[in-house]
Amino acid sequence: MFLGEDYLLTNRAAVRLFNEVKDLPIVDPHNHLDAKDIVENKPWSDIWEVEGATDHYVWELMRRCGISEEYITGSRSNKEKWLALAKVFPRFVGNPTYEWIHLDLWRRFNIKKVISEETAEEIWEETKKKLPEMTPQKLLRDMKVEILCTTDDPVSTLEHHRKAKEVVEGVTILPTWRPDRAMNVDKEGWKEYVEKMGERYGEDTSTLEGFLSALWKSHEHFKEHGCVASDHALLEPSIYYVDENRARAIHEKAFSGEKLTQDEINDYKAFMMMQFGRMNQETNWVTQLHIGALRDYRDSLFKTLGPDSGGDISTNFLRIAEGLRYFLNEFDGKLKIVLYVLDPTHLPTVATIARAFPNVYVGAPWWFNDSPFGMEMHLKYLASVDLLYNLAGMVTDSRKLLSFGSRTEMFRRVLSSVVGEMVERGQIPIKEARELVKHVSYDGPKALFFG
């Protein structure tokens, strides 16, 4: 039965295990919600605004079905966009987006209809009636979200995180420090960003010393607002020793507008990653490395819509083990590190790294891997090579608030099914299985990030 009680639960033990975890609170150490939207607490106007307006998963699949861009990110009305989505939605079967949006509809709106061209108008009208009472804060409480960590630039004032402590009840909203723009010396706008950091923190960032001082001040500012983790997007990690004099010369050259060589770009990024690691060591923050996303791969999308518009891909030609060796050994036992990989063929590398370094954790199946298929493969491999018990928990990695409910439910069901299968095969007693799914779903990530 579609989305029935046994949805994704493939054995009797799985049903018992899911009942142990389905109502646990949600802790999410990595997402892309905007704290401003939560604080302002304005209800959405329509179902497209909820499900499609910020979701590049939806955009990509609509493009795959031949929908014109004007019905995705263009000038058409939200209703026209929703009707266009519903018309092709049956083609999404097998992709997790099909299940996530139906879960949102069934669990949050209590509208148990299958999305199609025939039901689109009814769903539009029914959700329109219910949305005025479904504010962001109420939904977070209804989904039992206990803690969420947004992703924030070091230049941020964090004013809405500060306000959240005063006006948001029952949910803790914390920032995450994401200094990618500080490190990406090869990206357009780097100098302007460095100057902005200087203005924000009262430092002369034309010098390396001033820039690092501004970053330290930002780090402290985030700490004062409850931050517990940093986050770094690395296409291919390449972190090694770089002398400070070398980094200083590169910084000054880049700031003056001179073109850098590829070696200089690599050296600067390696130097900065080591600085970020030392900052995190001081505050005992978790360092999250998201590895393997080749961003803005489709030029036409990037030129017209900018980043995060559905033009990113996965690539497997990466030297992860070699690129992380220096960083991991320098911070061996000194820094909690979570490794997320986009290509599933990299899982053996990070799983065996975690097995070798007790302070390293494998992150949740991420982005293109957060389907039932991807999760099952990820969990089974991790259990067989490292410790499933040590998985760094589930992250929504989403810009869409309703994802907290649907994505977490899907993960907990798949986890229960994987562990339940071990019970059915006689590999694990049911008592230990209950403790395992509870730890992975809630206790473990809460202790790792917030303990």
From Swiss-Prot:
Family matches, as InterPro entries: Metal_Hydrolase, Uronate_isomerase
This protein's pathway: Carbohydrate metabolism; pentose and glucuronate interconversion
SUPFAM superfamilies: Metallo-dependent hydrolases
Keyword presence, Zinc: no
Source species, domain of life: Bacteria
Family annotation (Gene3D superfamilies): Metal-dependent hydrolases, uronate isomerase, domain 2, chain A
Family matches, as Pfam families: UxaC
Keyword tags: Isomerase
GO molecular function: glucuronate isomerase activity
Catalytic reaction list: D-glucuronate = D-fructuronate; aldehydo-D-galacturonate = keto-D-tagaturonate
Protein name: Uronate isomerase
Organism this protein belongs to: Thermotoga petrophila (strain ATCC BAA-488 / DSM 13995 / JCM 10881 / RKU-1)
Gene: uxaC
